[in-house]
């Protein structure tokens, strides 16, 4: 009887081990996840769109406040309205998260991952700060999802690489004096919050033929002084967030910006915003590369049809046919009803 129980225990352990597989997250940590992942708590805003692009949105059982408020995500993926919001203002509802019983929790910071791992959750850090890291993160998510997701990940990366190659082929040899100073403001609600060096935003600015106007500040969403902005004298200003036309007018009338070359020469632009903000860390950055290139170096990219590229991308990866009007709303940072 004792031998039988030992054999039974050993077989249970073997079966348990056989049901797990190992995957590396963005910190290089080897994480054991179920052989078939069915329930994902997507607690990094932009990763929700990556999962959608890879065909894995049906596995999301918890999302974030940022995503729940995105009217484009809801339009394209109506089930979003039924998914609990368990990350609000960067705080996780642990009790509710436990009740959702996720196979994997996706996070953006090591600290968040450590805290959740201590509570017994299986955690994958998915965040990235440049395009090479983004490729790794997309592959990781494809591997995690399984099924046809790895192939969709390859397709998404291929699309990214195609646009990078197209743009870099025309901008790589630009001399410094041909690269305008570009300031990227996170959103219209705070005109002093910018994105510095060492960010994905900095990557697409450089790729598109510009240079970051703010060189002394590193990292995303950093608050700087009005004096720093005035001293940097950006030649182009790009502002993210929704209702970007309102933000552009706010910048033009701001005493901080009125003396900059960007305002004087009419080169203040609102960044497109669709299922995720194009300028940030979602799948739409594939389109951002082209839009930024046309915006920063219009003479070099007059042949690029952003509308056609956007429609094709949304059809393939968002499974949605954009109308001409909807494309126009995305460019202006408006919702699907044009508001």
Question: Which stretches of residues belong to each language-model region?
Answer:
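Short helix-initiation/N-cap motifs at beta->coil->alpha
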Residues: 26-28, 83-95, 217-226
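Ligand-binding pocket segment of bilobal, Venus flytrap-like solute-binding proteins
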Residues: 203-204, 215, 221-242
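Sec-dependent N-terminal signal peptides
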Residues: 4-15
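A ligand-binding cleft/hinge motif common to bilobed small-molecule-binding domains
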Residues: 111-119, 240-254
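Short helices/loops that flank or line small-molecule/ion binding pockets
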Residues: 91-101, 119, 224-233
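A short, structured surface patch at a secondary-structure boundary
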Residues: 41-100, 104, 109
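Extracytoplasmic substrate-binding proteins
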Residues: 113-191, 214-216, 267-334, 338
């Amino acid at each position: 009887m004792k031998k039988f129980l030992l054999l039974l225990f050993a077989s249970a352990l073997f079966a348990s081990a056989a049901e797990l597989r190992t995957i590396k997250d963005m910190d290089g940590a080897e994480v054991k996840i179920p052989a078939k992942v069915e329930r994902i708590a997507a607690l990094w805003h932009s990763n929700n769109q990556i999962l959608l692009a890879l065909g894995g949105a049906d596995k999301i059982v918890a999302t974030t406040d940022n995503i729940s408020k995105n009217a484009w995500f809801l339009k394209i993926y109506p089930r979003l309205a039924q998914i609990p919001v368990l990350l609000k203002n960067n705080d996780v509802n642990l009790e509710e998260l436990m009740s959702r019983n996720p196979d994997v929790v996706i996070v953006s910071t090591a600290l968040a991952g450590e805290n959740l791992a201590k509570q017994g959750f299986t955690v994958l850090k998915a965040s990235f700060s440049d395009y090479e890291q983004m490729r790794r993160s997309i592959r990781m998510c494809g591997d995690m999802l399984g099924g046809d997701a790895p192939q969709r990940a390859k397709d998404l990366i291929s699309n990214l690489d195609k646009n990078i190659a197209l743009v870099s082929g025309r901008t790589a040899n630009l001399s410094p004096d041909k690269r305008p100073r570009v300031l990227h403001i996170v959103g219209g609600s705070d005109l002093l919050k910018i994105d510095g060096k060492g960010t994905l935003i900095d990557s697409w600015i450089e790729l598109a033929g510009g240079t970051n106007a703010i060189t002394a500040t590193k990292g995303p969403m950093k608050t700087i002084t009005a004096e720093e902005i005035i001293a940097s004298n950006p030649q182009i200003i790009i502002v993210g967030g929704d209702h970007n036309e309102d933000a552009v007018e706010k910048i033009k009338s701001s005493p901080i910006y009125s003396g900059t070359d960007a305002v004087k020469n009419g080169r203040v632009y609102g960044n497109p915003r669709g299922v995720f903000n194009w300028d940030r860390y979602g799948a739409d950055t594939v389109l951002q590369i082209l839009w930024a290139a046309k915006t920063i170096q219009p003479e070099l990219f007059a042949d690029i049809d952003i509308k056609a590229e956007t429609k094709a991308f949304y059809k393939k990866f968002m499974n949605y046919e954009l109308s001409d009007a909807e494309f126009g709303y995305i460019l202006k940072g408006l919702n699907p009803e044009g508001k």
